[in-house]
């Protein structure tokens, strides 16, 4: 979990380094995402992971195929107009819930570990290279 914490911190440090008026500026992602949209995207997947972990803990989880593109579009549509302070708070709360749910599991679970990794450190690492570039582009 050291990677999860380190990458989470880097992601937020990069976003925090942006001037407030640039956090919502489109261009981070080709489809017009901003850094705020990225934080909302990450937070939404962390929230989804928290739900899955609760289902694993209660024995109601059933693995199923996920349409990632559809979920990404749904998350973006639902969070795009939310103010950045609320987006940030949602992401932090979702991460805390996910980690708390993971730690409350009575026994280890490969499926839980997979969700933690995919929603957390692997997901952060997927987005960090472009975020680093975007921060540099906006800083010029």
Protein language model regions, located:
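Short hydrophobic/aromatic-rich motifs at helix boundaries and adjacent loops
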Residues: 7-8, 22-25, 67-72, 98
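Alpha-helical bundle segments that constitute or directly flank the non-heme di-iron/ferroxidase center
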Residues: 1-22, 44-54
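Short, charged, low-complexity loops and linkers
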Residues: 1-3, 31, 76-80
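Short, contiguous alpha-helical
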Residues: 25-70, 103-140
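Hydrophobic packing residues in well-ordered alpha-helices of helical domains and bundles
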Residues: 1-8, 84-91, 117-120, 124
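Acidic/histidine-rich alpha-helical segments that form the ligand environment
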Residues: 71-111
């Amino acid at each position: 979990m050291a990677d999860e914490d380190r990458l989470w911190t880097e992601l937020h440090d990069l976003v925090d380094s942006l001037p407030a008026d640039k956090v919502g500026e489109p261009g981070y992602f080709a489809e017009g995402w901003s850094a705020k949209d990225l934080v909302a995207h990450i937070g939404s997947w962390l929230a989804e992971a928290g739900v899955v972990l609760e289902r694993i803990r209660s024995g109601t989880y059933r693995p199923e195929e996920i349409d990632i593109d559809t979920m990404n579009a749904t998350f973006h549509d639902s969070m795009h107009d939310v103010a950045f302070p609320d987006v940030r708070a949602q992401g932090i709360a979702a991460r805390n819930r996910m980690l708390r749910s993971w730690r409350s599991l009575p026994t280890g679970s490969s499926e839980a570990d997979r969700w933690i990794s995919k929603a957390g450190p692997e997901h952060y690492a997927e987005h960090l290279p472009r975020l680093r570039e975007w921060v540099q582009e906006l800083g010029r």
